[in-house]
Amino acid sequence: MCQQVVVVANTNNKMKTSYSIKQVLKTLFKKQQKQQQKPQGSLESLESVDNLRNAQVEEAYYAEIDENAANEKLAQLAHSQEFEIVEEQEDEEDVYVPVRFARTTAGTFFWTTNLQPVASVEPAMCYSMQFQDRWAQA
């Protein structure tokens, strides 16, 4: 009889170990199922965060486009004003400078002078003896 009790005790131990393995496996599976369910919820939250970020980026792009459009209009306005100023300055700065040339056996020589027309020539005593002609050989 003693042997049977020992065997029964051994079977109880075997049952206990299998029972404990089952319990451990059940808890593992439950934890795994809970962890799988949590990412689904977090995926939804990640998706909403991603949508929010996309909306913010889109708003930033639209704001930048509006700002660039305004800046382009300002740049065009400034450019047109600069162009008008440059045209006015060119009109004011256009000075006719006669170019004179002479062909010789040594080559063709070109020169300019800053002498005024004959009507506005001052008396000869006001002129200095420094030559102000510019010349170059072609």
Curated annotation (Swiss-Prot):
Keyword Flavoprotein tagged: no
Keyword field contains Protein biosynthesis: no
InterPro entries: Malpha/m4/m2
Keyword set, alphabetical order: Notch signaling pathway
Residues forming coiled coils: none
GO biological process assignments: cell fate specification; negative regulation of Notch signaling pathway; Notch signaling pathway; sensory organ development
Gene Ontology MF terms: ubiquitin protein ligase binding
Superkingdom as given in the UniProt entry: Eukaryota
Disulfide bond sites: none
Function, in words: Part of the Notch signaling pathway.
Family the entry assigns: Belongs to the M4-like protein family.
Protein name stated in the entry: Enhancer of split malpha protein
